[in-house]
Amino acid sequence: MSLDYVKFTNGFEKFMPKEYRDMVEHGPFGKKVSVSQMGSFKEILEEHPMCAGCAMTLFIRLAMIAVPNPEDTIMVGTAGCGRLAISQAAIPFVYGNYGDQNGVASGLSRGLRLRFGDKPKDVVVMAGDGGTADIGFQQVLHSWFRKERFTTIMLDNEVYGNTGGQESGMTSRGSVLKMAPLGKKFDKMDMVGLAKLAGCAYVATVVPNNPRRVESVIKKAVLIAREVGAS
């Protein structure tokens, strides 16, 4: 986890695929880039197998640009639509068992601080509403209680979109889904309120139709988690 891991080993550049050479030469590693510069540098995430027009994929692209030091960052995820794109990004990605992403991130975050001391090494969890608010809720909440120094990003599309359309805790009351044909009968979970109650140092909600705000929020979240506690 350093700028060195994305560079070429001497003498091997000519053997590397063009995509890799482009990433080293024109990617964001070791540079300060912004969403306002999209199109002028090679993004960490470009090609992906997500559905055409998926807003979640746009958000993931924006979040990857916003990460302050991508060369010193590990992404952690779990089952869900989002991991199909996250796993294609040029950032180390740890894919845990369903719902254990915040437990994995807790160990990684602590281990990196022990190994590298004061050098900034960031851990960012990115998972869907099912993995975060339902199946992984226990580990998510307790990582917040412990003030673990990493960022948790919930990709809330209000449905288990990868397994047929089941309702989740984050589905809005009354929403009709393939696996909830009569509509959800319960309210959407207040994850923002729960995060505040658990003592997160920084809590925010964003939508991908405001790229500059996405960039600002993600950057703040990672930097605050690095120095203060859970975000």
Predicted ranges, named:
Residues F8-T152, M170-S172, K184-K185:
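Cofactor-binding active-site loop characterized by glycine-rich and histidine/acidic residues
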